[in-house]
Swiss-Prot record:
Record-linked PANTHER family: BONE MARROW PROTEOGLYCAN (PTHR10068), CELL WALL ADHESIN EAP1 (PTHR10068:SF14)
The VWFA domain, residue ranges: 43-228
Ranges of biased composition (kind: Low complexity): 301-388, 465-567
Gene Ontology cellular component annotations, sorted alphabetically: plasma membrane
Native organism taxonomy: Eukaryota, Sar, Alveolata, Apicomplexa, Aconoidasida
Positions of the UniProt region annotated as 2 X 11 AA tandem repeats: 603-624
Compositionally biased residues, Polar residues: 657-671
Protein name: Sporozoite surface protein 2
Region (29 X 3 AA tandem repeats): 306-392
20 tandem tetra-/hexapeptide repeats: annotated span: 402-514
Residues annotated as domain TSP type-1: 235-281
Gene: SSP2
Length: 827
């Protein structure tokens, strides 16, 4: 911790870190690899069993060949593997010493093994301990190479003579870093002992022990060869890298490369790493909208379809004036040389055509070319297409086609390219057969052939039967044929004025009887449906204004059908019994005690101008509400008196002259059965309660002695906080002097009992006692403070109460105070 607090130490550590970092940048790249190395410096000590248990045959056939295999697989040299050989039986003998003959050369070692195979015969016992001690002596004398690995290989077929001694020497060699391996050959090998001798567990795998028959001796040596030739991890320096090249791209992510020369086969000569210089500018993405623009013109091509009906090539549009076939039509009737003119007037077969039974109606029409009834043909309901043919002459075909495309379809089903229905030269005879006009008929307006227009595209098969038709002499009749004078029969064209029977055709206005579909206007008699205004007959429902006849509900005033009872509008709510009497006589107050609260007074009997005469009322009989003069008055239930501290008692009415006072009034109010209210301190009348069992008498009370009004005056309720039991009204008789008030001692005593006594005396006494206590406390505190301060100043002054104790007794007292517990008498 002290070092961490030392700034110099921290500075030195920082410098070391920087230097290591800089040196690390200059170090060559290194790679780690492993390879099998058999040329390491190893000293192999071979201990060969030459006891008689092996036998000469095994010695010659198996033992010596196994040693030759081991030598052949080792890299024996002066610097790498050195070999020593010791033969043990009863005694041990070192055949090859380390760094001696045959120790560093394979050829020398093979020669020794061949001589041993031919000249030695196994004999004696197994003295393994003596051979182990030879190896131990080499280690102790440092006859080995300190950098070399020490390995001892034992070849035996039996159990050593001294097991404990042999085991002890093996452990001693292991402590000196000598590895021991055993190869057991033959039938008498003790495997358990050999495993313990090597240092392996009894049942665990042991790499330093191998056993088997003599035939397997050469195979058993191979595991030991792997121990000698081990894989060693090595580090190779691959060389220094060159500088990094520039990034492969000028923007965004790229790669850079560096190279070096190969110094080892496992090294890499080239290295790449990602790099990034800067972000590349974003390339604007072409808008997608221009790609959609060519698709949009395809939409306008859709309305091209409505123009298809106006296509001049449309064969279904007979009304197109631009029909290229029409201009050739007018030339056909003007051609006098036309041999195919079916309208030859000399044609005798034409009259037979009207006999065509397939069209019985057509012969009637051509017989009268000027038939004014032709205009009625458009009215033929069976052929509504007829009126459509003349109309294209007078109407705009473009206007008519969209409105009625269907009427135009029947004529175009069999269009005639030679049809003179060209609007430029109308044929006056077309109305003769408006159903199927024949372009060649105008040549003979007088005798049209109705059957020819039945198939205008194909000539009448009867025409070739006309012998006169090839005769051109009739063609001079074509002077008639050039019925151009008949073209002035265009005056017959004014028969088109008959065609303006199309005004009858505007019987289609009868078709616009679809306006009669606005008979829905009759349906939209919804104007009549706005009879919903009649539904708002709810205005009649707003007869609810009659419902607000709820003002008639205030007919509840009529509910008090007792007009006599409400005849006194001044009668108050019967729930307030005290107030209803006030309006009864506003001039003279009424004593509420004289009234029976249980018997409501009749407002009709009360006279606001006259006081109530108690004699006129029958005091003996209670007022019966059923005896009221007006039977319509509904009497209220009797109201019991209630306590109301806010009500000021009203002085009684003093009867005037002519009024008799009841004679049964007591002279002293205390003797009366009537409970007189007495005010409390709070201003409440304690006697005016529901618990009172006394009632106002209904019988006349005898008047007192000389003063007939005294008894009545004694019934006056006492005002609030008054000590007088008798209060006289000044309005009784102003001439009479007020009588002296007689106090009631009993009432005073009762009132004083209810009042709480004043606590002022206790307050004064408490104040005096508190003051004295404060003074006493102040004096005691002063004496205590003065005594303690004086003792501190005086020093060795006597303690308090010390002068009280005699001098002779002071020592005794002090001794008594400082006695030990065991010295006490009570102990």
């Amino acid at each position: 911790m002290k070092l961490l607090g030392n700034s110099k130490y921290i500075f030195v550590v920082l410098l070391l870190c920087i230097s290591v970092f800089l040196n690390g940048q200059e170090t060559l790249d290194e790679i780690k690899y492993s390879e099998e190395v058999c040329t390491e410096q190893i000293d192999i000590h071979i201990l060969l069993d030459g006891s008689g248990s092996i036998g000469y045959s095994n010695w010659k056939a198996h033992v010596i060949p196994m040693l030759n295999t081991l030598v052949d697989n080792l890299n024996i040299s002066n610097d790498e593997i050195n070999v020593s050989l010791t033969l043990f039986s009863t005694n041990s003998r070192e055949l090859i010493k380390l760094k001696g003959y045959g120790s560093t050369s394979k050829d020398s070692l093979r020669f020794i093994l061949a001589h041993l195979q031919n000249n030695y015969s196994p004999n004696g016992n197994t003295n393994l301990t003596s051979a182990l001690l030879v190896v131990d002596t080499l280690i102790n004398e440092r006859m080995y190479r300190p950098d070399a690995i020490q390995l001892a290989i034992i070849l035996t077929d039996g159990i050593p003579n001294d097991l404990p001694r042999s085991t002890a020497v093996v452990h001693q060699l292991k402590r000196k870093h000598v590895n021991v391996a055993i190869i057991g050959v033959g039938a008498g090998v003790n495997n358990e002992y050999n495993r313990i001798l090597v240092g392996c567990d009894r049942y665990a795998p042991c790499p330093y022990y191998s056993s088997g028959s003599w035939n397997e001796a050469q195979n058993m040596i191979k595991p030991f060869l792997t121990k000698v030739c081990q894989e060693v991890e090595r580090i190779a320096h691959c060389g220094k890298w060159e500088e990094w090249s520039e990034c492969s791209t000028t923007c965004d992510e790229g790669r850079k490369i560096r190279r070096r020369q190969i110094l080892h086969p496992g090294c890499v000569s080239e290295m790449t790493t990602p790099c990034k210089v800067r972000d590349c500018p974003q390339i604007p993405i072409p808008p997608v909208i221009p790609n959609k623009i060519p698709e949009k013109p395809s939409n306008p091509e859709e309305p091209v379809n409505p123009n298809d009906p106006n296509d001049p090539n449309n064969p279904n549009n007979p009304n197109n004036p631009n029909n290229p076939n029409n201009p050739n039509n007018p030339n056909n009737p003007n051609n006098p040389n036309n041999p195919n003119n079916p309208n030859n007037p000399n044609n005798p077969n034409n009259p037979n055509n009207p006999n065509n039974p397939n069209n019985p109606n057509n012969p009637n029409n051509p017989n009268n070319p000027n038939n004014p009834n032709n205009p009625n043909n458009p009215n033929n309901p069976n052929d509504p297409s007829n009126p459509n043919n003349p109309n294209p002459k007078k109407r705009n075909p473009k206007r008519r086609n969209p409105n009625k495309p269907k009427p135009n379809k029947p004529n175009p089903n069999k269009p005639n390219p030679n049809e003179p229905s060209n609007p430029n030269k109308p044929n006056p005879n077309e109305p003769s057969n408006p159903n199927k006009p024949n372009p060649n008929e105008p040549s003979n307006p007088n005798k049209p052939n109705p059957n020819e227009p039945s198939n205008p595209n194909k000539p009448n098969p009867n025409e070739p039967l006309n012998p006169n038709e090839p005769s051109n002499p009739n063609e001079p009749s074509n002077p008639n044929a050039p019925s151009n004078p008949n073209e002035p029969s265009n005056p017959n064209e004014p028969s088109n004025p008959n065609e303006p029977s199309n005004p009858n055709e505007p019987s289609n206005p009868n078709e616009p009887s679809n306006p009669k579909k606005p008979s829905n206007p009759n349906e939209p008699s919804n104007p009549n449906e706005p009879l919903n205004p009649n539904e708002p007959s709810n205005p009649n429902e707003p007869s609810n204004p009659n419902e607000p006849s709820n003002p008639e509900e205030p007919s509840n005033p009529k509910e008090p059908s007792n007009p006599n009872e409400p005849s006194n509008p001044e009668e108050p709510n019967p729930e307030e019994p005290s107030n209803p009497k006030e309006p009864s006589n506003p001039e003279e107050p009424i004593n509420p005690e004289e009234l029976n609260p249980k018997e409501p007074s009749n407002p009709e009997e009360s006279n606001p101008k006259e006081p109530i005469n108690p004699e006129e009322s029958n005091p003996k009989e209670p007022i019966n509400p059923e005896d009221n003069e007006n039977p319509l008055i509904i009497q209220d239930e009797p109201i019991e008196p209630r306590n109301d501290s806010n009500v000021i008692p009203i002085l009684p009415i003093i009867p005037q002259k002519g009024n008799n006072i009841p004679s049964n009034l007591p002279e002293n109010p205390s003797d009366s059965e009537v409970e007189y209210p007495r005010p409390n301190d709070n201003g409440e009348n304690s006697n005016n309660t529901m618990k009172s069992k006394k009632n106002i008498p209904n019988e006349p009370i005898p008047s007192p002695g000389d003063n007939p009004y005294k008894g009545h005056e004694e019934r006056i309720p006492k005002p609030h906080r008054s000590n007088d039991d008798y209060v006289y009204d000044n309005n009784v008789n102003k001439n009479n002097k007020d009588e002296p008030e007689i106090p009631n001692n009993e009432y005073e005593e009762d009132k004083n009992k209810n009042q709480s006594k004043s606590n002022n005396g206790y307050k004064i006494a408490g104040g005096i006692i508190g003051g004295l206590a404060i003074l006493g406390c102040a004096g005691v505190g002063y004496n205590f403070i003065a005594g303690s301060s004086a003792a501190g100043l005086a020093g060795a002054e006597p303690a308090p109460f010390e002068d009280v104790i005699p001098d002779d007794d002071k020592d005794i007292v002090e001794n008594e105070q400082f006695k030990l517990p065991e010295d006490n008498d009570w102990n």
